[in-house]
Amino acid sequence: MQFVDEFRDPELAKSLLQRLQKIMEKQPHFTPENPLYLMEVCGGHTHTIFKFGLDRLLPKSIEFIHGPGCPVCVLPMGRIDVCIEIARRPEVIFCTFGDAMRVRGRLGSLLEAKAQGADVRIVYSPLDALNIASNNPDKKVVFFSLGFETTMPSAAITLQQAKKQQVKNFFVVCQNITIIPTLHSLLSQGQVKIDGFLAPGHVSMVIGSEPYQELCDTYHKPFVITGFEPLDILQAILMLVTQIAEQRCEVENQYKRIVHQHGNELAQQAISEVFRLKASSEWRGLGEIAESGVELTDDYQCFDAEVHFACQPHQVADDPYSRCGDVLIGKCKPADCPLFAKKCNPDNAYGALMVSSEGACAAYYQY
């Protein structure tokens, strides 16, 4: 298959690995006991690394840290409770992406709410939810708008359409978050040693490569934006290792077939019309992060489900035995969590990192 097979070529992979090995041999200060730490921010990268066994092919002096780039994984329990509270209303059809169905809050999960009689539906696009609203004028249709900048354009365009069509029974619960402030928070705390970053491809497709430059300049860490195939990942690692060996600190773009310097400007325009930054947002396991989330602008406040239904914020503490937050910032591996593969597994997911198809714990368990 074009654009897939050529990025899974075993001979090219072997060549990249040999080049990596040669560079690392010239860096004797990095050892298996004191490795070079690279954070792959995106959960999609985590799954590629484990699915294709890249972690076992790389030099032992390179170790991965799994970052907070999975929106379902950082979804606070209190936000799920708000969704369940709305979904239980008899006049509501609640629409969500499938990954969010099994994330647990204090009140349970959306899947359990559906089993108890709530009209909860899985959709693949916010436009699907808008169509449901148009076809059910006697119902209030609520879409759970969840995700990083990757999903924000489709949500913004859907709300623009709802406004244009004067759809009065369509609302959103806004849980869209942004990646750059999160990485700022992670780096400013200095809790985890990170030598370089594999930056997310899909988010960068929207925001471009430029926003990473401030992080690079402020914290003196190299970034390489990369795609999701095995050769994408290997080439990006080679680019990072080369920068570190040459004592350079730059933002490089391995994913040039998709990502451009300024990103998708039409998508950015739609986002800026519909959304604005919030003062702060809560992240599961990470706490409050300044300017890391968005809310609807004044022109689109009429679509805010939490305003319409007068929802109160839910503050729910994470389980003290769960180490989701530590996994998200690289302080521990999934297997170090006492719940991993015991109380928390894919069939009975306790933590969000096990629920999501992009979660680090799900990747560890599966592969």
Regions found by a protein language model. Name each.
Residues 13, 17, 51, 80, ...:
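Alpha-helix initiation and N-capping motif
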Residues 144, 148-211:
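Phosphate/pyrophosphate-binding betaalpha-module
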